[in-house]
Amino acid sequence: NGVLEATSGYMGGEIENPTYEQVSMGNTGHAEVVEIEYDPNIITYNELLEVFWRNIDPTALNYQFADVGSQYRTEIFTVGPKQMDEAIKSRDELENSNKFDKPIVTAITEAPVFYIAEEYHQDFYKKQSARYKIYAEASGRKGFLEKTWSED
């Protein structure tokens, strides 16, 4: 599919080398993020943006479904002016599509230092599949995404 690596981590905060325990308190300024390494010959940055938009609620400020706190904000961290321009264009197109009743609040910023999350956070959905399945069902995410994107 073009994605070579997806690494869980933290970005955007003030604390160096944060731990999950620190970030989960919501006062470090960091967001929980995924760093994507991809092959642009197989999947484009714009295609990755499309996947991103279709898997979040971009109108939710400082929460995503059952997860509440600034560490759960939606934010696109870009590398270089080309990614910045493409991300802004993508967000603007989504905003202008009138897909959502509320404004899109997803921030787009230059990528600061990426801190890799602890090993137990990598591929959490695989390592804790039963726990993740219960969470995914109870969060309301699936229903929201199906309702929002069912016509596409």
PLM segments and residue spans:
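Flexible coil/turn and secondary-structure edge motifs
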Residues: 1-152
